[in-house]
């Protein structure tokens, strides 16, 4: 959540940031500024009434002790109390109204994020490893998976519906091996391995920004205040929800393997075959909580950790800087890692590493104490990596002419 003070102190900057994102609010932002201004005035008035009430209460106590006449003071206290209660209710309602409006405004765009309308305006930063030249036409992963008996798409539909899969046999062993390899690499790079619930309450999804704006994208448990997590970013970040961290304990670096659940609202017709876009998938996530001065360096650290895994698996990939129009809701700056898929003859996203600055920390009340002062931390998140998409890339890049799959040396010890 952005700081409401910014709307009063630097309204034009906030408006420009939303314009960069193509986030239309019409005159809603101006109205919100007016509401915040009115709220501030009422808050000052409320504080004045509270101070007056305290002052008169003390006078009342002194006169009572002296057994003096207190009838006038009593009337004054009762009259002021009515005003105080009415104004307190008004201030509380305004605060709720402001917080609701602020909760659906996306993060401010980082100055390092280039201006652009959509993914077409994203900028390639660098390529790592050269794509292999095949002497045969490479197949797509779903063809290879079915040929080798690794993935049963029909059973996934039977058990649930479309966009679910069953992984079995040697394919399941590879899938498990990838998870272990990812966790080991992340742990080596200083990230603590954590296992968390796959269900969270509404407050946690608000903290990381999925709610209230993206309610259609998550699965809710009927008659419960519980949701299936769309990513371990939610659980790892919110481990420190409403927490004050000693500055000596920063940075906090965490990694988790979890199932992830997404409704994929708005994805009809996209990636209908295979494992690229599923309602349920596994992901190994990285989350970091840092001092504001250290978040840029942490983003580079997280990118390197994810890239190291891809290099170990001999998978060509590239870094792509997302433009302002393609940023996620909570992100201030995002760099994607896209892996080469020869079967599709293109690069596809396998990781997004985002710096949210203090946006999530303000929503989730994640603070740190430095020099006896509480400050908002910075939070970052990124995949390291999406397991299904890594398996897709492994099959397509390491396929042989007969349809068999070469296993990279780094993965052998996990099989």
Curated annotation (Swiss-Prot):
This is Serine--tRNA ligase. It catalyses: tRNA(Ser) + L-serine + ATP = L-seryl-tRNA(Ser) + AMP + diphosphate + H(+); tRNA(Sec) + L-serine + ATP = L-seryl-tRNA(Sec) + AMP + diphosphate + H(+). ATP binds at residues 262-264, 349-352. InterPro entries: aa-tRNA-synt_IIb, aa-tRNA-synth_II, aa-tRNA-synth_II/BPL/LPL, Ser-tRNA-ligase_type_1, Ser-tRNA-synth_1_N, SerRS_1_N_sf, SerRS_core, tRNA-bd_arm. Pathway: Aminoacyl-tRNA biosynthesis; selenocysteinyl-tRNA(Sec) biosynthesis; L-seryl-tRNA(Sec) from L-serine and tRNA(Sec): step 1/1. GO terms for biological process: selenocysteine biosynthetic process; seryl-tRNA aminoacylation. GO terms for cellular component: cytoplasm. One of its GO terms (molecular function) is serine-tRNA ligase activity. It is found in: Cytoplasm. Homodimer. The tRNA molecule binds across the dimer. Consists of two distinct domains, a catalytic core and a N-terminal extension that is involved in tRNA binding. Its EC number is 6.1.1.11. Keywords: Aminoacyl-tRNA synthetase, ATP-binding, Cytoplasm, Ligase, Nucleotide-binding, Protein biosynthesis. Catalyzes the attachment of serine to tRNA(Ser). Is also able to aminoacylate tRNA(Sec) with serine, to form the misacylated tRNA L-seryl-tRNA(Sec), which will be further converted into selenocysteinyl-tRNA(Sec). The gene is serS. Pfam families: Seryl_tRNA_N, tRNA-synt_2b. CDD domains: SerRS_core. Belongs to the class-II aminoacyl-tRNA synthetase family. Type-1 seryl-tRNA synthetase subfamily. L-serine binds at residues 231-233, 285, 383.
């Amino acid at each position: 959540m952005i700081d409401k003070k910014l709307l009063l102190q630097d309204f034009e900057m906030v408006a420009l940031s939303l314009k960069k994102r193509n986030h239309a609010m019409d005159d809603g932002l101006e109205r919100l500024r007016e509401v915040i201004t009115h709220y501030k005035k009422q808050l000052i008035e409320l504080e004045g009434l509270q101070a007056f009430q305290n002052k008169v209460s003390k006078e009342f106590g002194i006169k009572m002790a002296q057994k003096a006449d207190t009838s006038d003071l009593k009337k004054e206290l009762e009259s002021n109390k009515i005003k105080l209660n009415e104004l307190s209710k008004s201030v509380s309602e305004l605060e709720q109204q402001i917080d609701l409006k602020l909760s659906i405004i996306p993060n401010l765009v980082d100055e390092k994020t280039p201006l652009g309308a959509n993914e077409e305006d994203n900028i390639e930063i660098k390529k790592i490893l050269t794509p292999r030249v095949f002497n045969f036409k490479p197949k797509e992963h779903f063809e290879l998976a079915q040929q080798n008996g690794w993935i049963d798409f029909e059973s996934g539909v039977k058990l649930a519906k479309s966009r679910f899969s069953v992984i079995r046999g040697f394919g399941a062993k590879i899938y498990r091996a990838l998870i272990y390899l990812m966790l080991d690499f992340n742990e080596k790079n200083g990230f603590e391995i954590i296992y968390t619930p796959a269900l969270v309450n509404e407050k946690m999804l608000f903290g990381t920004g999925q709610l209230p704006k993206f309610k259609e994208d998550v699965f809710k448990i009927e008659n419960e205040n519980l949701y299936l997590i769309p990513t371990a970013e939610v659980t790892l970040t919110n481990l420190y929800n409403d927490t004050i961290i000693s500055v000596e304990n920063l940075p906090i670096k965490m990694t988790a393997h979890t199932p992830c659940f997404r409704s994929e609202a708005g994805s009809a017709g996209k990636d209908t075959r295979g494992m690229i876009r599923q309602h349920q998938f596994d992901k190994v996530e990285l989350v970091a909580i840092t001092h504001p001065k250290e978040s840029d360096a942490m983003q580079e650290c997280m990118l390197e950790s994810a890239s190291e895994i891809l290099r170990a698996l001999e998978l060509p990939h590239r870094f792509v800087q997302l433009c302002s129009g393609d940023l996620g809701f909570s992100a201030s700056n995002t760099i994607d890692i896209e892996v080469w898929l020869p079967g599709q003859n293109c690069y596809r996203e396998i990781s997004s590493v985002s710096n949210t600055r203090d946006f999530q920390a303000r929503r989730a009340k994640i603070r740190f104490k430095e020099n006896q002062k509480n400050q908002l931390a910075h939070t970052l998140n990124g995949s390291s990596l999406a397991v299904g998409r890594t398996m897709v890339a492994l099959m397509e890049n390491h396929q042989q002419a007969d349809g068999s799959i070469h296993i990279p040396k780094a993965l052998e010890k996990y099989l």
